[in-house]
């Protein structure tokens, strides 16, 4: 139940909020796609922790690049 709720929130962000901000993510896959995959693979708790860690790395002083879900 929690996992589905988190995945739904991520999809709402991807379809309705992200298009308004434009492409700003420094990574591939994007942070929202990374979060979706992390929750799908690792579950709601560990996936959310991985997603938060990734989002904290997404800033102008980080080079970005390819960073797949472990």
From Swiss-Prot:
Location in the cell: Cell inner membrane
Entries under Pfam families matching the protein: YidD
An example Gene Ontology CC term for this record: plasma membrane
SMART domains reported for this sequence: Haemolytic
Keyword Cell membrane annotated: yes
Recorded family membership: Belongs to the UPF0161 family.
Function as written in the Swiss-Prot or TrEMBL entry: Could be involved in insertion of integral membrane proteins into the membrane.
Full protein name: Putative membrane protein insertion efficiency factor
Record organism: Desulforapulum autotrophicum (strain ATCC 43914 / DSM 3382 / VKM B-1955 / HRM2) (Desulfobacterium autotrophicum)
């Amino acid at each position: 139940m929690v996992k589905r709720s988190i995945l739904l929130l991520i999809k709402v962000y991807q379809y309705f909020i992200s298009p308004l901000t434009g492409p700003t993510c420094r990574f591939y896959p994007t942070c929202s796609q990374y979060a979706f995959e992390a929750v799908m693979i690792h579950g709601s708790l560990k996936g959310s922790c991985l997603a938060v860690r990734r989002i904290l790395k997404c800033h102008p002083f980080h080079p970005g690049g390819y960073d797949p879900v472990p």
